Amino acid sequence: MTRSPFRRLVFGTLRRLLYLWVRSETINQSSFTLNLDRSRPVFYVLQNPSLTDLAVVDTECTKAGLPRPVLPVSVGSLIEPAAFFYLTPDPDWLGRQDKRGAPPTLTRLVSALSQNAAEDAQIIPVSVFWGQSPDSENSPWKLLFADSWAVTGRLRRLLSIMILGRKTRVQFSAPIHLRELIEHNKGHERTVRMAQRILRVHFRNLKAAVIGPDISHRRNLVKGLLNQPLVKQAILDEAERENISPEKAKAQALRYGNEIASDYTYTAIRFLEVVLSWFWNKIYDGIKVNHIEGVQKVAQGHEVIYVPCHRSHIDYLLLSYLLFRNGLTPPHIAAGINLNMPVIGSLLRRGGAFFMRRTFKGNPLYTSVFNEYLHTLFTKGFPVEYFVEGGRSRTGRMLQPKTGMLAITLRSFLRSSRMPIVFVPVYIGYERVLEGRTYLGELRGASKKKESIFDIFKVIGALKQRFGQVAVNFGEPIKLAEFLDSEQPGWRQQELGPQFKPAWLNETTNRLGEKVAQHLNEAAAINPVNLVALALLSTTRLALDDRAMARVLDLYLALLRKVPYSPHTTLPEGDGRALIEHVKDMDLLSEQNDALGKILYLDEQNAVLMTYYRNNVLHIFALPALLASFFQSTSRMSREQILRYTRALYPYLQSELFIRWTLDELDAVIDQWLEAFVEQGLLRFEKDVYLRPAPSSRHFVLLTLLSKSIAQTLQRFYMTVSLLLNSGQNSISAEELEDLCTVMAQRLSILHGLNAPEFFDKSLFRHFIQTLLDLDVLRRDEAGKLSYHELLGELAEGAAKRVLPAEIRLSIRQVALHRSEDAADQVAPPVQND
């Protein structure tokens, strides 16, 4: 085709005509060009013969300044008329293809390189996608639309160009060095076959990652669920249990399948992309995506399960949009059945949502159908997304994982581990969450309202506000097989039973949930709003002068750069003053001028709302804040003392906030933080002792502000232990203690003017009590009453003296004592008068 000037002229004319309509872009171009050796000859390989694909590749190479595929290239003494070839050879004049034959260009290259050991050639697989969609229907009309696994001819390609040509994506993959294959010394023919096999596997895996694996259409998929052994048995059990015919039970199972299954279509995905592109540009100043390269790599050859944090109803829309824009298949998304409503539910279903009931209890047939549907998605390699937190976090904290979906995933993998599963944590960080106003009531302590898609319409009136930027950070993937190998060695050889529910399933699932939550927190995107909230909420009056505020923010940034929380955590750009201006522009920060300068403060509404953004990053500052707390009541501490008290308190902070470090790693991390404190002037180190600055110094003020960020958490811990100790051994249940703690916290928040609803959040007390039980600090007797270790009081008071001011400890003890006396009066017998 390119052997003569005439053919080059024809090709150039075709390319220009094609681009009167077609618009193309390259996926992940930067990571590809980094791996390219410009000093070595480059050959492009396309999977199937296509002049239009070649024209698109040639255009993208020209745009990127890469060698063009249609120009001659030399390898030693070999001169090839063009720098491309097709993995599947051109058809003969009857239209027949010999798919087993080797491309002549590849054969000549291997021969030339075998004769010249100094030469090499880079083979770059290139894929052109005319739209992205899984082949979810077999109707002739839909086969005309997007790239799929079906084999179709020139008519379909023509219509694909007409319909989807303006959404064409090109994927350049990492170069394959032919020299490395030749050095295996397999001989000419075996080397050619090896290269062909590598390329075939590569194209198959890439296609699955970009357009999704091959699945049957929805009706056949749902009907197929009913023919699986576990579902067939569940149908028979349902018929016997409900005293109905097997046909009626099967019809019910079919209704469940139709209620659950998604109806994934390219049309809906493309519609959502257009709408969401407008929406993001309308309300956000930008969307930053970090570390997606690792996902693009792991998506090939793995069943990917995205596990994002859940802060807003738009989380799943944002993630699907970004995956689609970055050349990855949007996942099938687990959605609550409350979202399956007219119009909205249909659109979500076509966008990949499958619906699940909030509880499966008492409905084994539904459970079986749902589990089988997920198992089908997993084993076919279709990406899936679900939220391990269950509902949206109204407080900004990472919620305790709901392990139901994780357990279903684990059981599916135990049933068939042929397709390796990898969990991809996704942290979504908002500078202003869209539902912020609707969260205000709950942040002030009102009861949680039932979730509804209509929540999103309540924010329409707030769209005139500035919402800043959104950061989407992809965390470190968790490979399920490796996790099971570490948690349950030999799991592959174990007898798992017909239901695939080994005795260790619940405990292992809980640990998997904790690991996912920790990896999510590791990927946190720290933004200016988080840091401003952290600083101002640590002050007594929620105010600082602008210079002091800038110093605090600069300190936080310096500490985080000195001791990075994790490689996946991201920091904002700019210094403290730039961060202040950014938050002021978003109307989250108020300003007052006087003769001495500017005062920055939070008004009443923003003060409550900013607790949400502070809580987003509390896990990152918990350990340094704890270390700073030690020096509020003492001027000097040895390293041994610091390590001792930190190790005593850390397990409870780690459990509540999902902090990443293990106890074995803790000492080294503490040393890093202490070194950073000394470097920033927050501490001095003299004669093996750490000394705090003078109380009147600027550095002591900074140290105190840092310590305040964790103060309320430590107060809750001390409050719980004080109530328990005052109640005595075996006299109160966990539920009663939880209720007492909640009431006491509400009272203390009024007495001390605390404006933080999570201070009296019952679930936090419940989790702390459970952690005490898990660590054997507490035990339950047969009646459910709690007993505690005899050293608990001494340890609690010793640690409390180090981290809590005397007036706070006294106030907590007084309220706890009065509460115990009131309880004693209620159970004491009445006094008999003669």
Curated annotation (Swiss-Prot):
UniProt motif HXXXXD motif: location: 309-314
> Record's GO cellular component, any one?
plasma membrane
* One Pfam family linked to the record: GPAT_C
Q: Keyword Protein biosynthesis, does the record have it?
A: no
Which reactions does this protein catalyse? Answer: sn-glycerol 3-phosphate + an acyl-CoA = a 1-acyl-sn-glycero-3-phosphate + CoA
What SMART domains does this protein map onto? PlsC
Record carries keyword Cell membrane: yes
Membrane topology category: Peripheral membrane protein
Which keywords does UniProt give here? Acyltransferase, Cell inner membrane, Cell membrane, Lipid biosynthesis, Lipid metabolism, Membrane, Phospholipid biosynthesis, Phospholipid metabolism, Transferase
As for subcellular location, the record says: Cell inner membrane
Annotated metabolic or biological route of this protein = Phospholipid metabolism; CDP-diacylglycerol biosynthesis; CDP-diacylglycerol from sn-glycerol 3-phosphate: step 1/3
- Which InterPro entries would you find in this protein's record? GPAT/DHAPAT, GPAT/DHAPAT_C, GPAT/DHAPAT_LPLAT, GPAT_PlsB, Plipid/glycerol_acylTrfase
**What are the EC numbers?**
2.3.1.15
Q: Which GO terms describe its biological process?
A: CDP-diacylglycerol biosynthetic process; fatty acid metabolic process
* GO molecular function annotations of the record: glycerol-3-phosphate O-acyltransferase activity
Entry's NCBIfam families? plsB, PRK04974.1
Which protein family is named in the record? Belongs to the GPAT/DAPAT family.
Domain commentary: The HXXXXD motif is essential for acyltransferase activity and may constitute the binding site for the phosphate moiety of the glycerol-3-phosphate.
Protein name, entry field: Glycerol-3-phosphate acyltransferase
